């Protein structure tokens, strides 16, 4: 009789443990899908580790996740889990493997970066420095603020836009309205890249705000 009770207890424990593992797995799996959509991750090599302890009987069929002011896309991330009327704070670790950009050769400070300066490699994304570029297109035509060495990951803190217009430069200002266009010459009051807003001062002292086009002209729409 005692032997039967022992086997029965072990059986119940096994079912509970299996159910708990399935719940934890399902939550991690749902988090994986959330991060893939949130960060547009194409990689299949993604793993989410939940660091916040959950109750053993916790289960949520349709959880809703929300990011909490995160500065990082990978590594330790703060999440709000909404399950019906329940709100839970989770600290999770996102591990992912995918492509990112490194310098193919030494890039001297002040260089307008080109495609042949770069190369893509595959590795752990969660161990990269903050703001690392994952796509070449986001980096090409930017200017590096310091020397970048071969095989070094490149971050957004190491580059700036390429200035089409520089501070105090004389620029063509085009004021555009319905069926008319007026052209002036003005002085830029700051540096500016293509499609950026910039303020210019006309000869009469009036200050206008416009958008820089690819010809280094400032377009003011009325």
UniProtKB/Swiss-Prot annotation:
Residues passing through the membrane, by range: none
GO cellular component, one term: periplasmic space
Keywords assigned by UniProt, alphabetized: Bacterial flagellum biogenesis, Periplasm, Signal
UniProt main location, coarse: periplasm
Superkingdom of origin: Bacteria
Keyword Signal annotated: yes
Similarity comment: family membership: Belongs to the FlgA family.
Protein name, UniProt field: Flagella basal body P-ring formation protein FlgA
NCBIfam families: flgA_cterm (TIGR03170)
Short name of one Pfam family: ChapFlgA
One GO biological process term: bacterial-type flagellum assembly
Signal peptide: 1-24
Location within or outside the cell: Periplasm
Known role: Involved in the assembly process of the P-ring formation. It may associate with FlgF on the rod constituting a structure essential for the P-ring assembly or may act as a modulator protein for the P-ring assembly.
Gene of this entry: flgA
């Amino acid at each position: 009789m005692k032997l039967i009770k022992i086997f029965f207890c072990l059986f119940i424990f096994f079912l509970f443990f299996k159910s708990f593992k399935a719940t934890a797995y399902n939550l991690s799996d749902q988090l994986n899908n959330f991060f893939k959509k949130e960060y547009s991750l194409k990689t299949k090599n993604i793993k989410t580790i939940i660091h916040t302890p959950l109750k053993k009987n916790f289960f949520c069929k349709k959880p809703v996740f929300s990011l909490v002011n995160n500065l990082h896309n990978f590594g330790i991330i703060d999440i709000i889990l909404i399950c019906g009327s329940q709100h839970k704070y989770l600290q999770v670790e996102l591990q992912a493997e995918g492509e990112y950009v490194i310098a193919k050769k030494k890039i001297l400070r002040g260089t307008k970066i080109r495609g042949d300066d770069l190369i893509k490699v595959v590795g752990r994304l969660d161990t990269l420095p903050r703001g690392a570029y994952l796509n070449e297109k986001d980096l090409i035509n930017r200017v590096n603020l310091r020397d970048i060495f071969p095989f070094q990951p490149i971050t957004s803190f190491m580059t700036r836009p390429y200035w089409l217009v520089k501070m105090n430069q004389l620029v063509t200002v085009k004021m555009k309205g319905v069926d008319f266009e007026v052209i002036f010459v003005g002085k830029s009051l700051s540096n500016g890249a293509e499609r950026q807003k910039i303020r210019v001062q006309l000869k009469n002292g009036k200050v206008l705000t416009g958008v820089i086009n690819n010809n280094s002209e400032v377009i003011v729409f009325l």
